[in-house]
Each structure stands twice: as structure tokens, then as C-alpha cells.
């Protein structure tokens, strides 16, 4: 079975969780890491034995080897990075929350639809009160 080549954008705590999880998946391989902090990026690349590193996510997205990305950055950056990744032809695993407002969420969905790529949300706490409130707002069209 051929491995899916993955780039992880954001090397903080959540990015490390993703990188460690991918290491346990037989058909996945993290081939690139991206972080705006060069020291942290170098440390995580060495720890996870990842050769390709980027401090600019656009450079990672331009890498034709990368088929999918995990977006593990601060919440205010979820939408622009997810949209750029989908527009670059990458599948996207997007950490929660999807974004900070409904209009940006619609933009992400539109980018997904236009790209034909997969978008997966990391919503492991779907039953939390906050998630239920968001669900109710979406259903009410707000």
C-alpha cells in the first residue's frame, strides 16, 4: 500500500499530537513540517526525522510531493491556511474550531467543493456545550 505524504503546519502541542498519530498509521508518512518559529521547527523535525521544513506554509503547499496537510495553527489562521491548501490541491485535516465566523466557514466549504479534495475536521469534542451552541447557530442559519 502506498503511503499518503503529509505536511503538518504548526509544530506546537497539537501539531506534535498529529505528527505522533500519523507515525502510527501504516499508510501515512509525514514528509514536511512548517512552523514560524525556526528553533521549534528544527527541534520537531529532528525528533520526528522529517527532512523537509518550511517557515512559510505557502512554500509547503507548493511542494508537489505533499498530498495532504494537517492545519494545527492558532484559530485565526485556520481559514486562510485551509483555503490555500485546498486551492493548492491538498487534502486537509483541520483542527477545531473550523474558523471564527460562519462566513469564513462557508469560504472553506466553497474551496473544498471547488478543489474536489477531502476536508476533515478534528472535532473530537463534538458533544461539548460550545459545539452544541455552534451546531444550533448553524441550523438556525446564523
For each feature predicted by the language model, list its residue ranges:
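Acidic-histidine catalytic/liganding microenvironments
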Residues: 25, 48, 63-64, 128
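Short, well-ordered coil/turn segments that N-cap beta-strands
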Residues: 28, 67, 90, 117-118
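Beta-loop-alpha module in the N-terminal Rossmann-like domain of NAD(P)-dependent dehydrogenases
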Residues: 18, 51-108
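A contiguous active-site-proximal alpha/beta segment in oxidoreductase catalytic domains
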Residues: 99-142
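Helix C-cap/helix->beta junction micro-motif
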Residues: 48, 88, 114-115
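Acidic/polar helix N-cap motif
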Residues: 10, 37, 56, 101-104, ...
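N-terminal Rossmann-like dinucleotide-binding module
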Residues: 1-48
Amino acid at each position: 500500500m502506498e503511503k499518503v505524504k503529509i505536511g503538518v503546519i504548526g509544530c506546537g502541542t497539537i501539531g506534535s499530537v498529529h505528527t505522533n498519530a500519523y507515525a502510527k498509521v501504516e499508510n501515512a508518512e509525514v514528509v514536511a513540517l512548517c512552523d514560524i518559529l525556526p528553533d521549534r521547527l528544527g527541534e520537531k523535525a529532528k525528533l520526528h526525522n522529517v527532512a523537509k521544513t518550511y517557515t512559510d506554509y505557502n512554500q509547503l503547499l507548493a511542494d508537489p510531493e505533499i498530498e495532504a496537510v494537517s492545519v494545527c495553527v492558532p484559530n485565526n489562521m485556520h481559514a486562510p491556511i485551509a483555503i490555500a491548501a485546498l486551492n493548492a490541491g491538498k487534502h486537509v485535516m483541520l483542527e477545531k474550531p473550523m474558523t471564527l465566523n460562519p462566513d469564513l466557514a462557508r469560504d472553506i466549504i466553497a474551496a473544498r467543493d471547488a478543489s474536489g479534495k477531502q476536508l476533515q475536521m478534528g472535532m473530537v469534542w463534538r458533544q461539548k456545550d460550545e459545539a452544541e451552541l455552534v451546531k444550533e447557530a448553524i441550523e438556525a442559519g446564523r
